Amino acid sequence: MISLKNVSKWYGQFQVLTDCSTEVKKGEVVVVCGPSGSGKSTLIKTVNGLEPVQQGTIEVNGTQVNSKKTDLAKLRSHVGMVFQHFELFPHLSIVENLTLAQVKVLKRDKTAAREKGLKLLERVGLAAHANKYPAQLSGGQQQRVAIARALCMDPVAMLFDEPTSALDPEMINEVLDVMVELAQEGMTMMVVTHEMGFARKVANRVIFMDEGKIVEDLPKDEFFDNPQSERARDFLAKILH
């Protein structure tokens, strides 16, 4: 489903990713964690071409992401992305936020797109807010809208880049609950997060990054019970204290 082979990336002279390789199979949930500046967000953004790379190959569902021939807009319509900040259009209502890309990118009929949007708002517990504007919703609600918007495109996989890090603590669980449901329904997911409770609950594997390298790529239980590197042990000791 998702394959990264020997991926390296530089910003000028500074190397942000070094020889990163991993695979995410269909239906797998892989959590990517590590200290700030370790390259986690950059790695996940390479998967749908938001961050170009200078070396290596990236494939999603058989499409080579970093090929000049690839239609990235088409690829991104199949790979949902949820960011740290919700990236909703402030001048559009919630349901309009959910229908816009369906109509413009997937060429769906407006009525069908609206129906799909309302159905997914119901799924994330926000059907009553369909005609409100983003500023009228809490951060947790806006992030749930962002997840619903990505799901409207019928993605084959979902990428999450620290989806709860901009939220107040009491709003984190309402977003994680939606993500847990998605995982349990079999959605293929790559998730950059510090929420280790979420990782323990639904991850199949955990990738630990440091200084632009994948240091560990282990089954969840093995990572938490017996991390191989001192750097990962130190990270877990601090985050699970």
Where are these regions (language model features)?
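C-terminal boundary and immediately downstream tail of ABC-type ATPase nucleotide-binding domains
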Residues: D210, D221-H241
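ABC family nucleotide-binding domain
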Residues: M1-K220
